[in-house]
């Protein structure tokens, strides 16, 4: 039997990880605590204020291996560097009751519907509980009235077991998802497209969903 841990890191000098002594549910649901010899972290809101445990914020990091600046790119320093040497990672997360970091997606992926922030990661996690779903991604589609609406992009384990938009929204309601976060469009794929880094290509999915919906082919 072999133990395993979760590790979260980036080129910005972030390093958080579980330990082999952590219970399995903690390993599966979090990325542990910062390695004190590498970095400190803060979770900040859009006003530059540190948020309390349990509340989602952008992950800021600072440590001896954090880059000092971008070379000849002051506009990037303005965007990604904060006072006191803190680096804005663009990742979202929160601290659970044990003080462990739980990731909540990328800040740039947040969907803003009618002024309300919607976390794609939250919806994706609930959809993955459906027995027929293999992979899923939530992407925004533009809307004249609300700014953006939520489109669910799904690859199934068995392509013959498609469900309707109404069926998946009812499933999500049973999982406790708020009404204002329910997806309003549904697209099926044999496999979700990937970036060269092996991550789901949400930009390609968003462009595809927008094109299909504008042409009247979306759900």
Regions from the language model: what does each represent?
Residues 207-219:
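Acidic/polar alpha-helix N-cap and adjacent early helical turns
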Residues 9, 14, 63, 68-69, ...:
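AMP-binding/adenylate-forming catalytic core of the ANL superfamily
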Residues 1-26, 39-40:
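Gly/Ser/Thr-rich phosphate-binding loop
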Residues 24-31, 79:
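Short, P/G- and charge-enriched loop/turn segments at secondary-structure junctions
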Residues 40-41, 78, 92, 191:
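Generic short beta-strand
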Residues 37, 132-135, 185, 191:
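Glycine-centered tight turns that cap/initiate beta-strands
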Residues 34-38, 49-80, 118:
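Conserved ATP/PPi-binding loop(s) of AMP-dependent carboxylate-activating enzymes
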Residues 44-45, 53, 81, 89, ...:
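Hydrophobic alpha-helical segments, especially N-terminal targeting/anchoring helices
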């Amino acid at each position: 039997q072999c133990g395993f841990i979760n590790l979260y890191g980036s080129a910005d000098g972030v390093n958080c990880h579980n330990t082999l002594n952590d219970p399995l549910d903690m390993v599966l649901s979090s990325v542990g605590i910062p390695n004190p010899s590498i970095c400190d972290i803060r979770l900040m809101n859009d006003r530059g204020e540190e948020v309390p445990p349990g509340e989602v914020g952008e992950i800021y990091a600072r440590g001896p291996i954090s880059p000092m600046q971008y070379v000849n790119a002051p506009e990037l320093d303005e965007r990604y560097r904060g006072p006191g040497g803190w680096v804005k990672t663009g990742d979202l997360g929160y601290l659970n009751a044990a003080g462990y970091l739980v990731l909540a997606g990328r800040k740039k992926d947040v969907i803003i519907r009618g002024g309300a922030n919607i976390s794609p990661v939250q919806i994706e996690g609930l959809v993955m509980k459906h027995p027929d779903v293999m992979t899923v991604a939530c992407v925004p589609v533009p809307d004249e009235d609300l700014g953006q609406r939520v489109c669910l992009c799904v690859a199934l384990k068995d392509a013959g077991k498609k469900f309707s938009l109404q069926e998946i929204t009812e499933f999500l309601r049973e999982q406790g998802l708020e009404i204002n976060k329910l997806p309003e469009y549904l697209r099926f794929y044999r496999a979700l497209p990937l970036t060269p880094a092996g991550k789901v290509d949400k930009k390609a999915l968003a462009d595809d969903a927008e094109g299909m919906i504008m042409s009247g082919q979306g759900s």
